[in-house]
Regions:
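Short hydrophobic beta-strand that contains or immediately precedes a catalytic carboxylate
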Residues: 34-38
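Short phosphate-binding loop-to-helix
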Residues: 69-79
């Protein structure tokens, strides 16, 4: 069953501004979103499951492609730009928004920061759902607030610690599992994850040394945008009817 997710006000306002920009000089058409992930399975599996959980009608009005590349940081952003051009040529459709999803992991700070700045400076801007240090931080925020830097192995142990009491003591975290979105939906809280990610973001407000924002994630902006599409589409329909 499709779900409703409460979107924080500051994200709703940003989405409304973006929708207003897109509306100008734009004919009515099916919107096209491209999500390009660093991982070939972990992140694509999560977002494919999330996509199927969006409110009824969103996928009728929006095409959402999720691609896993095996690339990282700067090379991922560069590949997403090439992928957009290639898909637009192949489909004769215009992609409205690109999002890239990648982790800090052990990559060079300069490459990580440069990738984020390239997204910000692109025209149109590329959405950047980065996480420092690993995507699994987003999973953990469905249960508790974490603001201490930890390694990937500890993420795995904490995920298992949060899920074992709910699904059974024999549970073992599988990095590329197709069930992760559903496990989090049934046993955690997406609204809590968005709230905690926003709280982490505020701890680094005004700082642009992104490689040192540990722990932190921007995944909630992408998730909120996807779940906010239903209201934005309704608003655009109302604007067309009144205009």
């Amino acid at each position: 069953m499709a779900r409703k997710v409460k979107i924080p006000n500051h994200i709703q306002k940003r989405l409304a501004r973006d929708a207003h920009k897109r509306k100008r000089n734009t004919k009515s058409k099916r919107k096209y979103f491209l999500i390009v992930c660093e991982g070939e399975k972990t992140e694509p599996n999560y977002f494919e499951s999330l996509k199927n959980d969006l409110p009824k009608g969103v996928l009728t009005s929006c095409r959402i492609d999720v691609e896993g590349t095996g690339r990282n940081t700067l090379s991922l952003v560069e590949e997403s730009i090439k992928m957009k051009e290639r898909l637009e040529n192949e489909t004769s459709l215009s992609i409205d928004k690109i999002w890239v999803v990648f982790d800090r992991d052990s990559f060079e700070p300069d490459n990580f920061n440069e990738a984020i700045n390239l997204c910000k400076n692109s025209l149109p801007e590329i959405g950047c759902a980065w996480t420092n240090e690993a995507f699994e931080l987003w999973y953990l925020l469905h249960f508790h607030f974490y603001n201490t830097a930890i390694n990937r192995e500890m993420y795995q142990k904490l995920i298992e610690g949060n899920l074992k009491p709910k699904v059974g003591e024999d549970y073992e975290y599988q990095k590329n599992s197709k069930e992760m979105y559903d496990l989090l939906k049934e046993n955690g809280s997406l609204e809590l994850a968005i709230r905690f990610a926003t709280k982490l973001e505020a701890e680094f407000e005004g700082r642009f040394d992104f490689a040192n924002h540990n722990p932190s994630t921007k995944v909630h902006h992408l998730v909120a945008e996807l779940f906010g599409l239903e209201e934005l589409l309704k608003k655009e329909d109302e604007d067309k009817a009144s205009g």
